[in-house]
Amino acid sequence: MTYMLLIIGAIILAIFLGEKFDVNAGIVGVVFAYILGSFMIGLSTDEIFALWPVELFMMIFGVSFFFNFANENGTLEIIGHHLIYAFKNHLFWLPFGFFFAAALISGLGGSIWGSVPIVGFLALNIAKENNLDTRIIAIAVIEGALAGGVFPFGPLGAIVQGLIASTGFADMAQEISWQLFIVSTIYPILLLLFLMFKDRKNDAYKQVELKAPEAFKPKQKQTLTLMTIFIGIMLIFPIIDNFTGGSIPFIASISDSLNLGLMGIVFGVIAYMFELADGQKVLNRTPWSVIWMTCGISLLIGVGVQVGITESLAALISYVPWPIIPVTIALLCGCMSIFSSTIGVIAPLFFTTLPALYATTGWSPTIMAVCIIIGGFAATVTPFSDGGSLLLASSGYLGKDQKDLYNTLLFRVTPFTVGSAAITALTLSIIHSI
């Protein structure tokens, strides 16, 4: 228990120091991992180096390297505009245009850091010009970006798979990733439907005028083709292998050899050779801050795992009444996510507890993983977290408009999304218990 408090305290202090001195919390996490690991726990430096999450690092880098070609040459932005424009004759459903545009851009490599600024700027200015409900728009853009981000072959999906692969449920990593993606997509869609039908008497949508998007240029068409091939390969061989039960050795061998991060690097090099975008600018887009945040905190947690912090945390959670453990996890992750990153901090901490949680509580690791993510994502809409701060920064709003958006995110959107995540977690736990 002492080590658990020490490691959690180190994580909190790393986040605080990162904010205070504008340094990446993951780098501070590496410092604490070294100090605590070597001088207090007694690990050798070789043992600490061995805890560095190599597969997680390669997954984030590989996926971002390839998909950043589509980000750099404008393919993702045009895809988003085409998707929004498809709703020109169905303007009541326009929030779903924003949702799916953000999800698609995020899932195809833009991640939340690319999709929220692209779609958010367009959506919020349409909202301002036509007096649309910014609560609906904010949820559509941010939750769409988050849902698309956990697409198993997307940037956040790669991180999730890498984190799960480091637990005792590595063989379930892809299955859990797909279920996370499905739940993370369905539940915000239900939220939007609820809010939209409450707002159905608002005639403002009828006044919206959408501009026709640009046509795809040759390089963008080539990029789109390469992305389709990449996703096809990553999907088709595992599906055939599962369908045939591994009875075709050639297919089984390819399926076992496919690695999301390494395949991303392969396709990134192909895109580089075809000059689909300026290669140096693509490399400059590498999300090093995310890589350092996630891997650095994972290293610190890895040091704690060596002295049993996951078992201690799971034992502490097991004192919660069994039926409400999933809801408690979702709310706890939601509260933590207000001031920290779900993928960079919360997921590395709680995913490591999945084997111990399963052993002590009997709850399915899939249910627990889903509750961790949807709980964390629910509070990402706050102005202090990734989604809300990105939306504020990219809105183009000034003065009173910006203050109103800030208040909407903090007081109207956050309680609604966190409460909805708790209800979703409760619903999933009831279904699982039947």
Where are each of the predicted segments found?
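Membrane-core helix-loop-helix motifs of multi-pass transport proteins
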Residues: 126-217, 364-371, 389-434
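Alpha-helical transmembrane segments
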Residues: 55-62, 175-189, 255-259, 366-382
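Transmembrane alpha-helical segments of multi-pass membrane transport proteins and ion-pumping complexes
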Residues: 60, 68-73, 90, 94, ...
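Transmembrane alpha-helix interface/packing and boundary motifs in multi-pass membrane proteins
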Residues: 14-23, 101-111, 142-151, 331-345, ...
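Hydrophobic alpha-helical transmembrane segments
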Residues: 4-9, 27-30, 92-100, 114, ...
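Membrane-embedded alpha-helical segments and adjacent helix-loop junctions characteristic
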Residues: 43-130, 137, 280-359
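Hydrophobic transmembrane alpha-helices of multi-pass small-molecule transporters
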Residues: 1-59, 67, 182, 189-309, ...
